[in-house]
Amino acid sequence: MGSMSVWHWVIVAVVVMLLFGRGKVSELMGDVAKGIKAFKKGMADDETQPNTATSVPPVGPNDPVRTLPHQGAPGTAPQPPHVQPHVPAGDHKAV
C-alpha cells in the first residue's frame, strides 16, 4: 500500500498529459534529449583535446628552482601593515 505501483505512475502520466498536452510534453522531452547530446559531445571534446596551455614542462633534477611571488585574491590590492601611532605617556587625551 505504501509503495508506488504501476497504476499510480499511469495515473500520474495521464494527469500530466491532460495538463500540459501531448505536444508540450514531447517538446520538453526533445529539449532534454538535445541537452544530453550536447553534454556528451562536450565531454567527448574535453577528453580528446588535452589542454596544452596549462601543462607544465617536465623538471629535471639539475634544473633551477623557480618560485612565483605571492599573490592575493584577484581584484584586491596588497594592504600595508597596520601600525598603531605612538602616543607619549603624558599626552593621553579623552576622545
From Swiss-Prot:
Topology of this chain in the membrane: Single-pass membrane protein
GO cellular component: TAT protein transport complex
Heme as UniProt keyword: no
InterPro entries named in the record: TatA/B/E, TatA/E
One of the record's GO molecular function terms: protein transmembrane transporter activity
GO annotation, biological process: protein transport by the Tat complex
Keyword Metal-binding: no
Pfam families (alphabetical): TatA_B_E
Location within or outside the cell: Cell inner membrane
Keyword entries, A-Z: Cell inner membrane, Cell membrane, Membrane, Protein transport, Translocation, Transmembrane, Transmembrane helix, Transport
Location of the region described as Disordered in the Swiss-Prot/TrEMBL record: 42-95
Principal cellular location given in the protein's record: membrane
Subunit structure of this chain's protein: The Tat system comprises two distinct complexes: a TatABC complex, containing multiple copies of TatA, TatB and TatC subunits, and a separate TatA complex, containing only TatA subunits. Substrates initially bind to the TatABC complex, which probably triggers association of the separate TatA complex to form the active translocon.
Function field: Part of the twin-arginine translocation (Tat) system that transports large folded proteins containing a characteristic twin-arginine motif in their signal peptide across membranes. TatA could form the protein-conducting channel of the Tat system.
Family recorded in the similarity comment: Belongs to the TatA/E family.
Listed name of the protein: Sec-independent protein translocase protein TatA
